[in-house]
């Protein structure tokens, strides 16, 4: 029963750290948006906002999340995909998207849709993506590219790293209590 209670406490602490991290990432993103977001001609009907780019500095995985709001009617939109030209560029290297073909998003007029694009193995020490190209289109063969320039990355640790950190801390705490 004691072990179960400790596990529960650990999980609660990990969740607490996770929510703190998520708040910090959001706060950082609010103050650090890409310097420029250029969209293709037909995307004048869209608004792109709330760009959040967070990386995990243990694995080098970077998640780019943003909201895309169609100003008029609803439709389906193909988004992302390595084979369609979605990639991030930093310090002369290209990092293709994790998806081969991307995903289909169902857009509703006036409602923001969260879009998530993952990039893997981004080299350590890169704190800004020079350019991110995200392909989008009404069909797989009519793709346009959204280009974001100077996208700041907020580096954080994975949940696993947070859990390990919490676990080590609690182990140290137990060791100290035993000495008293």
Locations of regions flagged by a protein language model:
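Short, solvent-exposed beta-strand/turn "edge" segments of beta-rich domains on protein surfaces
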Residues: 50-63, 104-109
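N-terminal post-signal-peptidase region of extra-cytosolic proteins
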Residues: 48-51, 69, 99-102
